[in-house]
Structure formats: C-alpha cells, structure tokens
Amino acid sequence: MNGEPILRFEDVSKIYPLPAGDVVALDRVSLTVDPGEFIAVMGPSGSGKSTLLNLMGCLDVPTAGKIYLSGREISRMSDDDLTRLRRDRIGFVFQQFNLIPLLSAVENVEFPIILTTDREESRRRAIEVMRAMHLDDALFTHRPGELSGGEQQRVAIARALVNDPDLLLCDEPTGNLDTKTGTAIMEILAEENRESKTVIMVTHDPNVAAYARRTIRIVDGRLA
C-alpha cells in the first residue's frame, strides 16, 4: 500500500528485569504495518506475542528501539499522551472480554467516550455500534453476567469500535468461544477490516489466522 505505515517498529526490544535475571520478551524487532492490513500474530506460548501487542497498543513502552504510529514516535511519550492516543486511535478486544460487571452492556460500550462526548451522543453512538454487531436491543440493559460468551464478545468489540479507531488490536478474540460463535466473531472482524480498519490479532488457532492476509510469527522474542 502507498503512504505512511500505520505502525513501524525499529529494533524494538522489551526486557523485564527479575531477581533471577532479565527476561527478554522482544529482541530487536523491526516491522511495518500498512493501513488496512489484517495481520495474525502467531508463536509458541511465551514467545512475545502479547508483549508485541501491548507495545503496539501503547499499553507498554519499549526498553530500546523506536515505535511510530502514523509517522509519530510514540515510544517516548508521557503516560498522559499515551492514554489520549489509545482513547482516540486504538481499540482493544481481549480473550476475557474485560467488561465491567456492574455496568449494563450499553454502558460498557459507551464507557470509552463518556468523558469526551455528551451523554446523548455517547448513548446514540453506543447503540449504533451494538446494532452493527447484531446485538438485540433487548440485551442492551443486561449486565455482562447475563450474556452468553458470544454476546459478551460482541459487546467487547462494540466497545472497541465506539471511538472509531484506526487500529483494532485483538488478543485471542475467539479463545473462550465455541467454534460456531468464534466463526461469527471472525466474520465481524473481517467485515471491519473490509471497511478500512487495520486489524492485528494474536491467535494460536490456524483457522482463525486464515482470516488474516499476513501472518507474523514470533519465536523467543524474535520474528521468525
């Protein structure tokens, strides 16, 4: 694709100091991600997949190297700037859903924008994306514990999309779902990608990875 990469890593390393010795989670990783790509990240347990995703999503900072988001270096930003960047540009989907148990489904979805958007508009936007996820209106007032796993993941995806992010990061998005429900979730992610979202997902499942157009493999913190 033409234009500036949405993500660029330059010799990025992440090292965790532990009493027993340093753990190198990522070792001099360089890569680029173009806008509109759909990428699967695969590798053995402990290979650095989640660390890579956390760095892509501004949830962590590298020990060494540089990370750029749409040409802007983010690897040395302040915590406040990283928080704003996550809020405005990035959506996250997690294996465990990470919904707030005491909030209703629609309140969970509008949560990322409630402080930056007036109440009426945040509710309208939340309902819009929930309907796009094929969630029945009757479920909007249900709390997460009253929803099935597939419904919870649809709510989680709606929450990730409510701020209309450029980049959607997914960590094992079908890991807690049965095959049929997982397929439905992957069709939703594929549709978001067709509508121009850049999607990067960590998965151990080759059938899930097959939805992506590129696969990045990590072994022992390095690109294989």
What are these regions, as identified by a protein language model?
Residues P17-P19, E110-E121, A132-H134:
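ABC-type ATPase nucleotide-binding domains, specifically the catalytic core motifs of the NBD
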Residues R72-E73, E121-A138:
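Conserved ABC ATPase "signature" region
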Residues G65-E73:
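Conserved ABC transporter NBD signature motif
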